[in-house]
């Protein structure tokens, strides 16, 4: 009873401490690395949960891998919170708390010792290396996989102690869910083999214990193949990073993660891969790993926690150690989320041994463990704070790393989003200096130059980017936008067509191409490009209206609204087309539609009020039009729409004149 009471008290403290350290993320935004792909710019996810979304999750890659359970969790967040980043962050925090409590419960169930179990769970929850997994929305897969990893372990322990087909079935199902949250869970069957030896102490022959894991190993094999296929576009080729370099970096990484676990300073969102890997680093790291492995092997019977903890660490790291490379990072904090537990096991039960050999040391061991966890929590609070926004995150990375292409690139994009064009260009040029053969680096410089108004230099940068990587659809789009802005529609269309061929499923590319085709007068071709795409139909309707075919435009817009009755953009367009029609009945309909749009708006909308004013003028209701124009001007000033103010001021003045002279239309 006393043990149970102590476990509950420690569990409550663990949960509270974890929430306190990470709750600050509720105020944080999304970051511009992976979060757009995972949530913000992924219509299948941002639309929330639906049958179509569930089907998409199980049949498509998401973030260059297959993890449908993670995709569904992002969809559920969008269903609950929309695109409020705080909600997405808090879900990750709650999942991390759950993983922590499950780990604590599993270790208590395995060992019957709450104190060392609490230390391991506390180090798992509160170590600065965990900040990336919890504070980064795109890393939802880590915390979700953590919950399912711990759940599988707990169910496995229950099955070992009271075997039954139903209990084993629960183990298999939960493990499969874990694999579908993050494929890194494939190593769990091997970790279960380790805990068979300690602390479970199963006396069955090794062969029998392996047979127990065969269904799990089979599932792991299938998901490994699926993952390799799904990640193929993102896998770094052997020509770029050879086998020798991969092995060298893996050896250094095994030691680096231990170093950062012991002394977590200089942590960053991205660590550039240095090639060739320094021979000295490989030698020292290899010697360290070999020595610890030898010590753990020799202690496998007398101190089994050293052997189990060290092999847990090594085995769990294998999928992400870089032998199969996805991305250009040398190491990553998030990769320690599950492997780091093994290192904590080694420390915690060494403390137990120390206290049992010298009972007088027990209070000292407890005090040291408590101070360590408090220090880790304080360091994690600081580390989580770096995730408050893009600029803070990448500036931190640049302070603690060298020649960081990713940090310069992403910081440039963040600064450009804040309209700090000169600062953005500086970081884009630094990225270009680091990797002058990267097409994306030239393209980013082009984006910043275009934003600064230097279109000639921007075009030169884009052309160089396409020379290096002609299959970059985004650069073709940027060139097309620049050409279209200068009136070179034919050339712009050619680049959009190349972008559409490279990204045949991109709605934005097809929409913009359709708009340009319609502007050029190729109405039929514009619609045939993607006949079911609503925005293409909208562009078609606009082109019809501009060419004087108002009746056809109205029919097209009515059909759009029949299919999507809540599409306000189509309602706005229809109101404007109706207001310009010579038929008085249609002008009256324009007024009714515009009035309804204004009435249902949650806040004063200058553009909606302007549409209403146009509708009133079309119906010769000039007093009402003057009032609507004035309200639109007030709304524009109140909401900071300074771009609309001059035009609205002119409209108010013109309408006032028309109303005074009896209203000439």
Go through the PLM ranges and name each one.
Residues 402, 436, 470, 504, ...:
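Short coil turns that delineate tetratricopeptide repeat
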Residues 387, 421, 455, 489, ...:
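TPR-repeat structural position
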Residues 1-453, 467, 474, 512:
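Polytopic membrane enzymes that build or remodel cell-surface glycoconjugates and lipids
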Residues 397, 430-431, 464-465, 498-499, ...:
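Canonical positions in the second alpha-helix
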Residues 405-417, 440-451, 474-485, 508-515, ...:
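Conserved alpha-helical positions within TPR/SEL1-like repeat arrays
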Residues 417, 451, 485-486, 519, ...:
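Register position in tetratricopeptide repeats
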């Amino acid at each position: 009873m006393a043990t149970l009471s102590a476990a509950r008290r420690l569990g409550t403290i663990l949960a509270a401490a974890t929430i306190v350290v990470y709750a600050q993320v509720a105020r944080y935004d999304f970051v511009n690395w992976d979060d757009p792909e995972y949530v913000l710019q992924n219509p299948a996810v941002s639309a929330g949960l639906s049958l179509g979304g569930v089907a998409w999750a199980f049949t498509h890659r998401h973030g260059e891998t297959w993890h449908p359970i993670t995709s569904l969790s992002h969809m559920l967040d969008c269903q609950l919170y929309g695109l409020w980043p705080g909600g997405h962050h808090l879900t990750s925090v709650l999942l991390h708390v759950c993983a922590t409590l499950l780990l604590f419960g599993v270790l208590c169930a395995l060992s019957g010792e709450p104190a060392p179990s609490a230390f391991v769970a506390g180090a798992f929850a509160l170590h600065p290396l965990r900040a990336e997994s919890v504070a980064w929305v795109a890393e939802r897969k880590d915390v979700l996989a953590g919950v399912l990893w711990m759940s599988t372990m707990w169910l496995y322990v229950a099955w070992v102690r009271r075997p039954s087909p139903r209990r084993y079935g629960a183990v298999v199902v939960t493990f499969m869910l874990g694999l579908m949250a993050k494929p890194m869970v494939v190593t769990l069957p091997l970790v279960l083999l380790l805990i068979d030896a300690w602390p479970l102490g199963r006396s069955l022959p090794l062969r029998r214990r392996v047979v127990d894991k065969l269904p799990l190993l089979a599932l792991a094999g299938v998901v490994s193949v699926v993952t390799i296929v799904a990640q193929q576009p993102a896998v770094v080729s052997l020509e770029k990073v050879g086998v020798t370099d991969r092995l060298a970096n893996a050896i250094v990484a095994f030691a680096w993660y231990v170093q950062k676990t012991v002394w977590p300073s200089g942590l960053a969102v991205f660590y550039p891969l240095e090639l060739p890997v320094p021979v000295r680093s490989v030698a020292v790291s290899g010697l360290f790993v070999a020595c610890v492995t030898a010590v753990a092997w020799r202690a496998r019977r007398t101190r089994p926690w050293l052997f189990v903890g060290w092999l847990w660490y090594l085995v769990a790291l294998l999928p992400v150690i870089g032998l199969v490379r996805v991305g250009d990072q040398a190491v990553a904090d998030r990769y320690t989320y599950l492997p780091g537990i093994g290192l904590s096991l080694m420390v915690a039960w060494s403390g137990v041994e120390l206290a049992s050999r010298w009972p007088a040391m027990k209070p000292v061991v407890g005090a040291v463990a408590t101070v360590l966890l408090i220090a880790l929590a304080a360091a994690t609070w600081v580390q989580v704070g770096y995730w408050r926004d893009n600029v803070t995150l990448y500036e931190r990375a640049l302070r603690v790393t060298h020649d960081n292409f990713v940090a310069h690139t992403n910081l440039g994009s963040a600064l450009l989003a804040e309209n700090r064009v000169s600062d953005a260009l500086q970081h884009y040029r630094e990225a270009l200096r680091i990797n002058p053969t990267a097409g994306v680096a030239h393209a980013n410089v082009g984006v910043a130059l275009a934003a600064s108004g230097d279109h000639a230099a921007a075009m030169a940068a884009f052309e160089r980017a396409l020379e290096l990587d002609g299959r970059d659809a985004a650069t073709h789009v940027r060139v097309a936008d620049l050409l279209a802005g200068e009136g070179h529609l034919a050339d712009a269309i050619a680049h959009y067509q190349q972008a559409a061929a490279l990204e045949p499923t991109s709605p934005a590319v097809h929409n913009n191409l359709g708009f340009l085709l319609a502007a050029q007068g190729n109405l039929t071709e514009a619609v045939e490009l993607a006949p079911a795409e609503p925005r293409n139909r909208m562009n078609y309707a606009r082109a019809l209206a501009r060419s004087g075919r108002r009746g056809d435009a109205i029919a097209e817009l009515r059909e759009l609204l029949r299919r999507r009755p809540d599409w306000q953009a189509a309602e706005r367009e229809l109101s404007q087309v109706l207001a310009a029609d010579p038929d008085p009945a249609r002008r009256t309909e324009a007024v009714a539609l515009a009035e309804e749009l204004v009435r249902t708006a949650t806040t004063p909308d200058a553009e909606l009020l302007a549409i209403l004013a146009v509708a009133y003028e079309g119906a010769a209701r000039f007093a009402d039009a003057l009032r609507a124009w004035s309200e639109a001007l007030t709304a524009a000033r109140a909401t900071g729409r300074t771009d609309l103010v001059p035009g609205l001021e002119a409209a108010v003045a013109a309408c006032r004149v028309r109303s005074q002279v009896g209203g000439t239309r």
